[in-house]
Regions:
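Short, hinge-like loop/turn segments at secondary-structure boundaries
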Residues: 58-62, 111-113, 136-137
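Structural beta-alpha unit
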Residues: 1-9, 83-118, 155
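A short acidic, glycine-rich active-site loop
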Residues: 61-76
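Glycine-rich, Arg-bearing micro-motifs that act as flexible, cationic patches
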Residues: 117-139
Length: 155
């Protein structure tokens, strides 16, 4: 179930970002929609708290400093997106940095918050603390418990 009003207008929107220009377009679309309908906007940035498979196979583990740095980077990305949304007129915007694989993090927040719309970009970028958004749309589309908006973000 979702928190959608009886009119079908979303009241709670979750959007994912990795800080890339393409993800910024998805956040901008979600923010514009939230502002237009007065919906709450929750911005999520996921970060990896586990060693990549090659590193783990070599018996190397991540220290708490690396995980803290990844969390801080994801939190900064989400916070900056939230500040832009608020500056653009979104009355109720919040942000979260969530440990885990991006599609799982987005699904979990969507479920936990009883959101009625999840917004993702069609493509993204990958770097040390940010994760590819391209496959996320595919992964969440099969399991999302609410409406899904995939924003065309090709350059």
């Amino acid at each position: 179930m979702s928190g959608q009003s009886g009119s079908g207008v979303p009241t709670k929107i979750v959007v994912g970002t990795d800080g890339s220009p393409t993800a910024d377009r998805a956040v901008a679309k979600a923010a514009a929609l939230a502002q237009a309908v007065g919906a709450e906007l929750i911005i999520v940035s996921a970060y990896n708290n586990r060693a990549p498979s090659g590193v783990a196979a070599a018996g190397i583990s991540l220290d708490s400093g690396w995980v803290a740095a990844a969390h801080s980077a994801a939190e900064t990305v989400a916070k900056e997106a939230g500040e832009k949304a608020t500056a653009g007129g979104v009355a109720n915007a919040s942000f979260r940095a969530i440990a885990g694989e991006p599609s799982e993090a987005l699904l979990q927040v969507t479920i936990d918050e009883n959101a009625d719309l999840l917004v993702v970009g069609s493509k993204g970028m990958q770097s040390t603390a940010r994760f590819l958004l391209g496959p996320i749309a595919n992964k969440v589309s099969r399991r999302v418990p609410c409406d899904l908006l995939i924003v065309e973000t090709s350059e």
